[in-house]
């Protein structure tokens, strides 16, 4: 042993004395997770409240830990839970088996299943770690209606997946849009009434080559 070896050991000790502690004061202070963190699963809804899950069971087939159980059923006109022909009547995830790998998310064809940032899954009951459909479903937001109910975003399943996601919903038109629509309807009705009465003004004419343009000479 060299004469400097003890000082080298103390150097490591003294160096750690000035480092900031890495201990998190959990659960009082929870660490913020990454945006794409693999946490508890969530079953998503369409903007009208219908479920995105169509009961195809692809997530269960893709699960390497056999942690997902799905039982599908047919929709009817009297009871509709999703826009498709079928919906997930029973949906369970066993978090005693789940390894949070995310393969079920990749297999889902309708983006019905996603992973949240909730990582607090510890429990002292094995039965409570088997999450049911009611526990996994996303909460109802403004404008949503709890199923079963008819389709409100279109007349077919295709309308739900081809609509512009940024477009306003049919029942969520803003006050300005409603006022503008009413003003346009009144203006159109006024023009029709004046034309019916035989009145005609320059303002009622529509230029052949666009508003404000002149006919080329």
Swiss-Prot record:
Gene3D superfamilies attached to this UniProt entry: 3.30.70.3270
Alphabetized UniProt keyword annotations: 4Fe-4S, Cell membrane, Iron, Iron-sulfur, Membrane, Metal-binding, NAD, Quinone, Repeat, Translocase, Ubiquinone
EC number: 7.1.1.-
Primary location group: membrane
Known cofactor(s): [4Fe-4S] cluster
Its membrane topology: Peripheral membrane protein
Residues that hold [4Fe-4S] cluster 2 according to the record: 63, 98, 101, 104
GO BP: any one term: aerobic respiration
GO CC terms: plasma membrane
GO molecular function, one term: quinone binding
Record-listed [4Fe-4S] cluster 1 binding positions: 53, 56, 59, 108
Domain 4Fe-4S ferredoxin-type, residue spans: 43-73, 89-118
Keyword Membrane: yes
Xref: NCBIfam families: NuoI (TIGR01971), PRK05888.1-3 (NF004537)
Function in brief: NDH-1 shuttles electrons from NADH, via FMN and iron-sulfur (Fe-S) centers, to quinones in the respiratory chain. The immediate electron acceptor for the enzyme in this species is believed to be ubiquinone. Couples the redox reaction to proton translocation (for every two electrons transferred, four hydrogen ions are translocated across the cytoplasmic membrane), and thus conserves the redox energy in a proton gradient.
Family: Belongs to the complex I 23 kDa subunit family.
Designated name of the protein: NADH-quinone oxidoreductase subunit I
Gene that this polypeptide is encoded by: nuoI
